[in-house]
Amino acid sequence: MRTSQFLLATQKETPSDAVVISHQLMLRAGMIRKLASGLYTWLPMGLRVMRKVEAIVREEMDAAGSLEVLMPSTQPAELWQESGRWEEYGPELLRIKDRHGRDFCAGPTHEEVITDLMRNELSSYKQLPINLYQIQTKFRDEIRPRFGLMRGREFIMKDSYSFHADQASLQVTYDRMHDAYCNIFTRLGLKFRPVEADNGSIGGAGSHEFHVLAESGEDDIVFSNGSDYAANIEKAEAVPRETSRAAPSEELRLVDTPDTKTIAALVEKFNLPIEKTIKTLIVHAEEEGKLIALIIRGDHELNEIKAANQPGVASPLVMASDAELRDAIGAGAGSLGPLNLPLPIIIDRSVELMSDFAIGANIDDKHYFGVNWERDLPVPTVADLRNVVAGDPSPDGKGTLEIKRGIEVGHIFQLGNKYSKAMKCEVLGENGKPVTLEMGCYGIGVSRVVAAAIEQNNDENGIIWSDALAPFQIALVPLRYETELVREATDKLYAELTAAGFEVLLDDRDKKTSPGIKFADMELIGIPHRIVVSDRGLAEGNLEYKSRTEGQAQALPVADVLSFLQARIRR
């Protein structure tokens, strides 16, 4: 491809509304253009990259035994009402009406559509298992679209769905898809981690997320430095560093604590170790009008997913208002504690191992110091309620936990029969009786992968693409292309490289475009390999080669360029 025949839409300046580096570089490199909030047009440069992602995804899905289909992006409300998600999904579901007043939605996901399809196509266990996938545009009406393609409203996604007669069959396919996802992200040249995850609104049992490691990531991912244990922050099990509770060494005493509504104020005023304090958080119970107390250590953060999964706790988690606290307890949020608290109590594992600690007295501006379990109050229900912190023991007993930032680019779920049961997706089993199918679903944010790859691979000059993702593998940059010697050598090499199967961008812009601008554009776009043709180099029988990831250029004999690139570029 010659630049004279291509839409080369690079920009020198960074748009003011682009915050994250992937958004900035995709705009500057001429990959995308904004149409409206959360909506982007893919220009030829960007689309070439996305097609590379799609091709690798298709190859690995096909190899894993998944069959490609294409479902409508507009979905009838009846299916979502049947599954129960029409109201559950919330305002992110864009609801529309046709001219006849019938309700539809712009599909954010396709569990209902695929389940409806399969209940009409499958009749016998002999047709199972089956795994279907599509690559298609989705729409989620994000309240605040931001970060370019990282959190847009319209995006490209690969979603696949599998159907099984039993859990054992589902597990086999789930493991196969897990491996396929690892293959995909490895082939894309990304540093990534699969982590255990919570199923969220999709429902079902087990799930894993796939995160591209990047400091700009929105998610915390947790992994052991001594094993392959990994989970997202919502799912990671918090194991106390302490193994036993120390014996009491202080007497219980009631202390006046004016102007200490926060843990930080209490610690500073009374010179307490923060590890000797607790947070008492009051939340709504499942039973209407009831409240439950959740208690974590003062230096820990409540994990709202874990908390909402506790028996009796309302989901999603709802904190009690100040009026509710005063009505039920008689004190405000800064003075609460478990002693004489007239509510059910759940404490974190770390709290169970505390001794001589400070708690609110359930009286404004008063705390108890020197509190000890069993001596002063019984140990209530104990559960894992907090977020892990770096240095916690790994739940598998091997090593300690580290935390890094990640960008979620894939998610696989074992759905169980959540949708198939609600929508009566059944086949006749081996014994001739109806069997409700077990389902799995598996998603990759194809357009998000492009942005995530840039977040992970960039420098001050622009994008750094892997050979697998680059829009072009080679930038061929002639200096003084208007001269016969340079033009003939450039055209000859261009023909040889393209005939050998390389994707080459020949920068044939005229002399009004300086060499510096040409080099800067190729680095901004992120083309991995650059060949410079100049009359000076040709006079010595050489061309100049430079890798996007290496600082120094090197001279190559003209006759050796093709073999050098064939050995260098991962095909």
Swiss-Prot record:
Keywords: Aminoacyl-tRNA synthetase, ATP-binding, Cytoplasm, Ligase, Nucleotide-binding, Protein biosynthesis. CDD domains: ProRS-INS, ProRS_anticodon_short, ProRS_core_prok. Its EC number is 6.1.1.15. SUPFAM superfamilies: Class II aaRS ABD-related, Class II aaRS and biotin synthetases, YbaK/ProRS associated domain. Its main location: cytoplasm. It is found in: Cytoplasm. GO terms for molecular function: aminoacyl-tRNA deacylase activity; ATP binding; proline-tRNA ligase activity. One of its GO terms (biological process) is prolyl-tRNA aminoacylation. It holds the Pfam family HGTP_anticodon. One of its GO terms (cellular component) is cytosol. It catalyses: tRNA(Pro) + L-proline + ATP = L-prolyl-tRNA(Pro) + AMP + diphosphate. Homodimer. Catalyzes the attachment of proline to tRNA(Pro) in a two-step reaction: proline is first activated by ATP to form Pro-AMP and then transferred to the acceptor end of tRNA(Pro). As ProRS can inadvertently accommodate and process non-cognate amino acids such as alanine and cysteine, to avoid such errors it has two additional distinct editing activities against alanine. One activity is designated as 'pretransfer' editing and involves the tRNA(Pro)-independent hydrolysis of activated Ala-AMP. PANTHER family: MITOCHONDRIAL RIBOSOME PROTEIN L39/PROLYL-TRNA LIGASE FAMILY MEMBER, PROLINE--TRNA LIGASE. Consists of three domains: the N-terminal catalytic domain, the editing domain and the C-terminal anticodon-binding domain. This is Proline--tRNA ligase. The gene is proS.
